[in-house]
């Protein structure tokens, strides 16, 4: 048995308060930094805290991160490449936090990147690109993005560092 967690973005934050429990949960402000998808606030600490809290609260022995990734405003450059530095930054920071959790004993046994290739998203259609491979939807030509190279390195070394 295992639990699968989809981890993308923080949805709220906690502040001290005079309330009985000593804290208050507030929604993320609209000005909070986000990726090209407005709903995808940048919060790599979620990759640390979500599995850590889930393991502690539910006494989990095996966790898989079943989805994590980001959209990006990917553009093919004149040299035929996609330099998606924002996605590399997102993945590097989230995976570093996940690595921190596993180093502390959180039982994360696997990670599934969303997504391998650009695809049709239910809400946004073909407008938002989540893949580490660029897809030309007219020709179906697949081109690895900079993030594909980074993620290949992550897999090869089993580490989030560059």
Regions found by a protein language model. Give the residues of each.
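Non-catalytic scaffold segments within catalytic domains of secreted glycoside hydrolases
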Residues: 1-162
